[in-house]
């Protein structure tokens, strides 16, 4: 089976910078406490006009431009995120629309938290090998600032927002191996909001019927 090699990357950060000093004014912490335990001095938060999808689009656009490829050459788009602005449409579909990627190619999200980008790479590798195509767009994007309790110093000091994107090329004689796993028994130790409870589903049924 062919392997993947990195052709180009892109990145995007939102507009609001939050320093350790900023956090020390809202929770019992300090720059020294955070830096010595995490190495983090500042993180970036989305402004009102930004979210995981807008960051993903910016990062993907930069990666595509750096690759020198045309949008039509991208065979699949996989985005890893647990903080998409909507359950549907996916971030990957928003990227597909914004960049003009072909509509007859797969585009979808995966949610595997911190390991999500690795899962997305593995998914892209499988798609290229089974469906054909040479290039994949893989994205990792989060807007965790909107999910974190700003009064909980065990989480608010760690998480921020941003996106990274990679154009990967399927190639002969390229070493490639991924080991994936999960420990669902520890799920009680990490939790997030019930996104499906926040808003009802909306759909223009007639319009969907016409293009489906």
Place the predicted regions along the sequence by residue:
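Condensing-enzyme catalytic core mediating Claisen C-C bond formation in acyl metabolism
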Residues: 1-48, 152-212
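Flexible, glycine-rich active-site loops centered on histidine and acidic residues
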Residues: 129-163
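Acidic, glycine-rich active-site loops and adjacent beta-strand->loop/helix elements
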Residues: 12, 80-85, 112-117, 140-145, ...
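Buried hydrophobic positions in well-ordered alpha/beta secondary-structure cores of metabolic enzymes
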Residues: 6-8, 34, 63, 77, ...
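Conserved catalytic cysteine-centered active-site region
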Residues: 35-54, 81-135
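Phosphate/pyrophosphate-binding loops at sites that engage ATP/ADP/AMP, CoA/4′-phosphopantetheine
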Residues: 59-75
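Acidic-glycine-rich active-site phosphate/pyrophosphate-binding loop
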Residues: 27-36, 86-101, 138-144, 193-200
